[in-house]
C-alpha cells in the first residue's frame, strides 16, 4: 500500500543543571540553569529530530547520533536536525508541518517562541506558518514542576516527496 502521509511523534526530556547554557529550539535563553546532555541538550530539537526520523521509519536520534560517539559531544542540535532532515528526504519524505509542546515551569518560553519557529522552519525548509510551538507549565507538579528538567513533545506530518 502506497500511503502518501505519515505521522512522526517525538519526545525528549533533559535535567536542568547549573553551569550549562539553556538552548531550546536553537535559541540560547538567559537562565540560571541549562540542560544536561552529551550534545547541546536542545530538548525541542531532539524531539523534532525523533519525530522526523520516526515518521520516515528511520529509527530515532540515538541510532543516528549516539551519545556514546565522541563526535557528537557538545554537538549543535540544529546541525543534527538538518542531517536528519537530509536522511528523511533521501528516504522519500518531506515534512508538511510541525506541532510542538514544551513543558517547562521556568523560564517563560513565549518570548522566544518566534525565534524557535524561525529556526525550525529554516532547518526543515518550511514556511514559519507550518511550525507551531506551545508552552505549558506543569503547575508545580512532578520533576518538571520542581524545575528539575524540561521536556518536549512533537508531532510531525510527513508527505511523500515527489
Curated annotation (Swiss-Prot):
In the record's cofactor note, how is the cofactor described as bound? Binds 1 divalent metal cation per subunit.
Residues under site feature: Transition state stabilizer: 38, 137
Q: GO molecular function terms here?
A: 2-C-methyl-D-erythritol 2,4-cyclodiphosphate synthase activity; metal ion binding
* Top-level taxon in the UniProt lineage: Bacteria
Q: Which pathway does it serve?
A: Isoprenoid biosynthesis; isopentenyl diphosphate biosynthesis via DXP pathway; isopentenyl diphosphate from 1-deoxy-D-xylulose 5-phosphate: step 4/6
Q: Which coenzymes or cofactors are required? A: a divalent metal cation
Give EC number(s), comma-separated.
4.6.1.12
Instruction: Give the UniProt keywords, A-Z.
Output: Isoprene biosynthesis, Lyase, Metal-binding
Name the CDD domains on file: MECDP_synthase
Which Gene Ontology terms describe the biological processes this protein takes part in? isopentenyl diphosphate biosynthetic process, methylerythritol 4-phosphate pathway; terpenoid biosynthetic process
Q: Which positions does UniProt annotate for 4-CDP-2-C-methyl-D-erythritol 2-phosphate binding?
A: 12-14, 38-39, 60-62, 65-69, 146
Q: Where does a divalent metal cation bind?
A: 12, 14, 46
Query: What parts of the sequence cross the membrane?
Result: none
State the reactions this protein catalyses: 4-CDP-2-C-methyl-D-erythritol 2-phosphate = 2-C-methyl-D-erythritol 2,4-cyclic diphosphate + CMP
Q: Which NCBIfam families match?
A: ispF
HAMAP family xref list = IspF
Family per similarity comment: Belongs to the IspF family.
How does this polypeptide assemble, per the annotation? Homotrimer.
What does the UniProt function comment say about this protein?
Involved in the biosynthesis of isopentenyl diphosphate (IPP) and dimethylallyl diphosphate (DMAPP), two major building blocks of isoprenoid compounds. Catalyzes the conversion of 4-diphosphocytidyl-2-C-methyl-D-erythritol 2-phosphate (CDP-ME2P) to 2-C-methyl-D-erythritol 2,4-cyclodiphosphate (ME-CPP) with a corresponding release of cytidine 5-monophosphate (CMP).
Q: What is this protein called?
A: 2-C-methyl-D-erythritol 2,4-cyclodiphosphate synthase
Q: Which organism is it from?
A: Bordetella pertussis (strain Tohama I / ATCC BAA-589 / NCTC 13251)
Amino acid at each position: 500500500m502506497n500511503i502518501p502521509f505519515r505521522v512522526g511523534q517525538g519526545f525528549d526530556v533533559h535535567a536542568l543543571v547549573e553551569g550549562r547554557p539553556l538552548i531550546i529550539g536553537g535559541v540560547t535563553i538567559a537562565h540560571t540553569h541549562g540542560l544536561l546532555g552529551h550534545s547541546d541538550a536542545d530538548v525541542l530539537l531532539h524531539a523534532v529530530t525523533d519525530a522526523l526520523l520516526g515518521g520516515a521509519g528511520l529509527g530515532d536520534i540515538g541510532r543516528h547520533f549516539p551519545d556514546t560517539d565522541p563526535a557528537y559531544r557538545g554537538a549543535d542540535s540544529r546541525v543534527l536536525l538538518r542531517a536528519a532532515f537530509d536522511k528523511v528526504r533521501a528516504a522519500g519524505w518531506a515534512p508538511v508541518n510541525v506541532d510542538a509542546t514544551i513543558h517547562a515551569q521556568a523560564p517563560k518560553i513565549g518570548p522566544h517562541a518566534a525565534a524557535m519557529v524561525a529556526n525550525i522552519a529554516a532547518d526543515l525548509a518550511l514556511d514559519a506558518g507550518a511550525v507551531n510551538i506551545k508552552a505549558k507549565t506543569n503547575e508545580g507538579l512532578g520533576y518538571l514542576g520542581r524545575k528539575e528538567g524540561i521536556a518536549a513533545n512533537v508531532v510531525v506530518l510527513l508527505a511523500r516527496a515527489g
